[in-house]
From Swiss-Prot:
Sumoylated; enhanced upon ERK/MAP kinase pathway activation, it positively regulates the transcriptional activator capacity. Sumoylation at Lys-96 probably requires phosphorylation at Ser-101. Transiently polysumoylated and desumoylated by SENP1. Sumoylation is a prerequisite to polyubiquitination which in turn increases proteasomal-mediated degradation. Probably polyubiquitinated by RNF4 and deubiquitinated by USP2. This is ETS translocation variant 4. Belongs to the ETS family. Pfam families: Ets, ETS_PEA3_N. Residues 90-115 are annotated as: Disordered. Transmembrane segments: none annotated.
């Protein structure tokens, strides 16, 4: 009975015993030391009830919540891998609550400036995070200065005051304005007009650099040339070179920016001009040399203009080519030299001379002609070519070459009759250029040797070929000259 009462007391007093402990601020050891001591008693066997388990879980949760509580003033913990990934891919991001951004502050935004009318598009605005480097941005020149080339990104000393005070100056209508504070989400929708001159009636920039104005304005100026040490001795080089041969008062790059050029290679011939470093459509101006006494940019020999940006080194220019005479290759008669006269030209020359009508002549039917004595024509052709062995068989084979070329044709059904295919005007203009007739040779240039001639000695031994000595021949008689 006593054990049953004791067991009943434990069943009823366990929740109250645990509830008398601190509700979560105590340690786990103090919360469990009481029931553990009673459960270890050999005389007490408490029944397992689900309420005890729920009480243990509730104390575990209260302990965890108490340890996990962090004051609101402390910063939250960010794992290391998160910061490492952001360091390589994006700017460092703090999870700590930031103060109110100055971009949303109406006192620091562009809303304090009065709205200006822009007829050519939106303003050229950038984020306020880039305000410190804005001092080196390319600004438009002073109202009284001349048009300056974009090749000079850094201004001179007299324009620096204007750059510092340009943040508070009001721009002229119709041109862009670089705002000091602007929204980071507002993107420029039009071309930044701050590179153009602010005066509406002043002349624009030089034409070869107009293509730079069609690009959007970057947040930082593009420095394409190496900046050298500024020497005050060359301060006058930035003045307009009007008295030194300047064109229309355009200003060439000042002494603040020095374009480095390669040294002249004296191994090449000075007559052949190499690739010019500047493609100018007018006369060129090169930089001053250290040994020159004159200040500024000196005028040198005019550069050769090249229309494209391709480096072309021609072998010779038009002015360097020597003009040869028209008759350089025609000092004498045009066909005097060996090999210069062609066969069809030789035939036209024979037909054009009336004294040759006994061995070659026109037939009167268009451009047809007949070789009355073909062997004589072949002999004369052999004299022109210095070939004594020339005959009509060789001449006729040469004429077949002109059949394929469309110059001559053989008249069918007639012997030694040919015709020219082309018109007479074209024929004589091609055969006699500049109306010069060929000078035909009447004899060979050198003595004829026996090797160049056909041997005819065997014909002298036969009496049949000498009718004046052998009398009338009887070819079919028994004593005739022909024996078979």
């Amino acid at each position: 009975m006593e054990r049953r009462m004791k067991a009943g007391y434990l069943d009823q007093q366990v929740p109250y015993t645990f509830s008398s402990k601190s509700p979560g601020n105590g340690s786990l050891r103090e919360a469990l030391i009481g029931p553990l001591g009673k459960l270890m008693d050999p005389g007490s066997l408490p029944p397992l009830d689900s309420e005890d388990l729920f009480q243990d879980l509730s104390h575990f949760q209260e302990t965890w919540l108490a340890e996990a509580q962090v004051p609101d003033s402390d910063e939250q913990f960010v794992p290391d891998f998160h910061s490492e990934n952001l360091a390589f891919h994006s700017p460092t991001t703090r999870i700590k609550k930031e103060p109110q951004s100055p971009r949303t502050d109406p006192a620091l935004s562009c809303s304090r400036k009065p709205p200006l009318p822009y007829h050519h598009g939106e303003q050229c605005l950038y984020s306020s995070a880039y305000d410190p480097p804005r001092q080196i941005a390319i600004k438009s020149p002073a109202p009284g200065a001349l048009g300056q080339s974009p090749l000079q990104p850094f201004p001179r000393a007299e324009q620096r005051n204007f750059l510092r005070s340009s943040g508070t100056s009001q721009p002229h209508p119709g041109h862009g304005y670089l705002g000091e504070h602007s929204s980071v989400f507002q993107q420029p929708l039009d071309i930044c007009h701050s590179f153009t001159s602010q005066g509406g009636g002043r002349e624009p920039l030089p034409a070869p650099y107009q293509h730079q104005l069609s690009e959007p304005c970057p947040p930082y100026p593009q420095q394409s040339f190496k900046q050298e040490y500024h020497d005050p001795l060359y301060e006058q080089a930035g003045q307009p070179a009007v008295d030194q041969g300047g064109v229309n008062g355009h200003r060439y790059p000042g002494a603040g920016v020095v374009i480095k050029q390669e040294q002249t290679d004296f191994a090449y011939d000075s007559d052949v001009t190499g690739c010019a470093s500047m493609y100018l459509h007018t006369e060129g101006f090169s930089g001053p040399s250290p040994g020159d006494g004159a200040m500024g940019y000196g005028y040198e020999k005019p550069l050769r203009p090249f229309p494209d940006d391709v480096c072309v080194v021609p072998e010779k220019f038009e002015g360097d080519i020597k003009q040869e005479g028209v008759g350089a290759f025609r000092e004498g008669p045009p066909y005097q030299r060996r090999g210069a006269l062609q066969l069809w030209q030789f035939l036209v020359a024979l037909l054009d001379d009336p004294t040759n009508a006994h061995f070659i002549a026109w037939t009167g039917r268009g451009m047809e002609f007949k070789l009355i004595e073909p062997e004589e024509v072949a002999r004369l052709w052999g004299i022109q070519k210095n070939r004594p062995a020339m005959n009509y068989d060789k001449l006729s084979r040469s004429l077949r070459y002109y059949y394929e070329k469309g110059i001559m044709q053989k008249v069918a059904g007639e012997r030694y009759v040919y015709k020219f295919v082309c018109e007479p005007e074209a024929l004589f203009s091609l055969a006699f250029p500049d109306n010069q007739r060929p000078a035909l040779k009447a004899e060979f240039d050198r003595p004829v040797s026996e090797e160049d001639t056909v041997p005819l000695s065997h014909l002298d031994e036969s009496p049949a070929y000498l009718p004046e000595l052998a009398g009338p021949a009887q070819p079919f008689g028994p004593k005739g000259g022909y024996s078979y």
